[in-house]
C-alpha cells in the first residue's frame, strides 16, 4: 500500500487534482482510500457525486466514542473509499489536532487493514505546512510520498518551497520523500519551463503539467471528476496520464529547499517579477 499526501497553497486545486487522479487510479483497477485533511471537507465530494459527507469529528461529537467504520467511510467512484476528518467549530480548537484525532481513529477502526486490499491511501492536506497538525502525515510517517500542487504564481511557488522545508525536517524521522511537483496551470507566462526549473533546483521532477481547461469546472458543477463526467475529453486523459506517472514513479527524494533570494531570482529569470 502506497501512502501519498498532496500538499500545496490554499486554492491551488489540491482537492480537484487529488480526486481526478484518484479516479484515474481507480479506473486502472487500483483500490484507493482518500482521507480529506481539510476542515472544509471538500476532498471527496466529486468522488461521491456531490454528497457532503459527515466528517469524522462531527460524527465523534454527535455519537461519542461509539463510532463504527461505516459511519465515517463512504464508497465513491471506482469503489474508492472516502472519509473526511473535518475540523473544530469555527473559532474553537485546532484543525490540525482534528486531523491527528481522525487518522488515529481510522487506524483504531481498521480502515487500513489488509482486508480492504488497498493499493493507495491519499491524504489531501490543507494549505501550507503551517502547524504541526497539518504536518502530521509527514511527521508521523503516515505518508511516504508527497506530491506538491503548484503553479507559476509566486505564492504557490513560495508555499511549495516551504512544504519542502517541512519534508526536509521530517525526512529522517518519518522516512517521507518528495515524489514531484504537479503543475496545475494558471496560464502564467513560461509556466511549464519555470516549474521544471523549480523542480530541478529542489532536486525533484515536475511529474505532470495539467493544462487549464474549463471542463474541470464543468465537471465540478455536475459534482463529478472529469473522468466520470466526460471520459473521452482531453482533460480526462491528462488526469489519466498523471495517475499513470504517479503509479510508475520511482523518483523519491529529500528536497533541497531554496533560499528566498534564489526563488526570487527564478521568478526574475522567467520574467514574472519584471
Swiss-Prot record:
Organism for this UniProt entry: Prosthecochloris aestuarii (strain DSM 271 / SK 413)
Comment on bound cofactor: Binds 1 [4Fe-4S] cluster per dimer.
Cofactors named for this entry: [4Fe-4S] cluster
Subunit-level organization: Homodimer.
Origin: domain of life: Bacteria
Alphabetized CDD domains for the sequence: NifH (cd02040)
Keywords: 4Fe-4S, ADP-ribosylation, ATP-binding, Iron, Iron-sulfur, Metal-binding, Nitrogen fixation, Nucleotide-binding, Oxidoreductase
SUPFAM superfamilies for this protein: P-loop containing nucleoside triphosphate hydrolases
Stated name of the protein: Nitrogenase iron protein
Sites bearing ADP-ribosylarginine, chain numbering: 97
GO molecular function, one term: 4 iron, 4 sulfur cluster binding
Gene: nifH
Residues engaged in binding ATP: 8-15
Lineage of the organism: Bacteria, Pseudomonadati, Chlorobiota, Chlorobiia, Chlorobiales
PANTHER family: LIGHT-INDEPENDENT PROTOCHLOROPHYLLIDE REDUCTASE IRON-SULFUR ATP-BINDING PROTEIN
Chain residues that bind [4Fe-4S] cluster: 94, 131
Processing and modification events after translation: The reversible ADP-ribosylation of Arg-97 inactivates the nitrogenase reductase and regulates nitrogenase activity.
Amino acid at each position: 500500500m502506497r501512502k501519498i499526501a498532496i500538499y500545496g497553497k490554499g486554492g491551488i486545486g489540491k482537492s480537484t487534482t487529488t480526486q481526478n487522479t484518484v479516479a484515474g487510479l481507480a479506473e486502472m483497477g487500483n483500490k484507493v482510500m482518500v482521507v480529506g485533511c481539510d476542515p472544509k471537507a471538500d476532498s471527496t465530494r466529486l468522488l461521491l457525486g456531490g454528497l457532503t459527507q459527515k466528517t469524522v469529528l462531527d460524527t465523534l461529537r454527535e455519537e461519542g466514542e461509539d463510532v463504527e467504520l461505516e459511519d465515517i467511510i463512504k464508497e465513491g467512484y471506482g469503489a474508492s473509499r472516502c472519509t473526511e476528518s473535518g475540523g473544530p467549530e469555527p473559532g474553537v480548537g485546532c484543525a490540525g489536532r482534528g486531523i491527528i484525532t481522525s487518522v488515529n481513529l481510522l487506524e483504531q477502526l481498521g480502515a487500513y487493514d489488509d482486508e480492504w486490499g488497498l493499493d493507495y491511501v491519499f491524504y489531501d492536506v490543507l494549505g501550507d505546512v503551517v502547524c504541526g497538525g497539518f504536518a502530521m502525515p509527514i511527521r508521523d510517517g503516515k505518508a511516504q510520498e508527497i506530491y506538491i500542487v503548484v503553479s507559476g504564481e509566486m505564492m504557490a511557488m513560495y508555499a511549495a518551497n516551504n512544504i519542502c522545508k517541512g519534508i526536509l525536517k521530517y525526512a529522517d524521522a518519518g522516512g517521507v520523500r518528495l515524489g514531484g511537483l504537479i503543475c496545475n496551470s494558471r496560464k502564467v507566462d513560461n509556466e511549464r519551463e519555470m516549474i521544471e526549473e523549480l523542480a530541478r533546483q529542489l532536486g525533484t521532477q515536475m511529474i505532470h503539467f495539467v493544462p487549464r481547461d474549463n471542463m474541470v469546472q464543468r465537471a465540478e458543477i455536475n459534482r463529478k471528476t472529469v473522468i466520470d463526467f466526460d471520459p473521452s475529453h482531453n482533460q480526462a486523459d491528462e488526469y489519466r496520464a498523471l495517475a499513470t506517472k504517479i503509479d510508475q514513479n520511482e523518483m523519491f527524494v529529500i528536497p533541497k529547499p531554496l533560499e528566498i533570494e534564489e526563488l526570487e531570482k527564478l521568478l526574475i529569470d522567467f520574467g514574472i517579477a519584471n
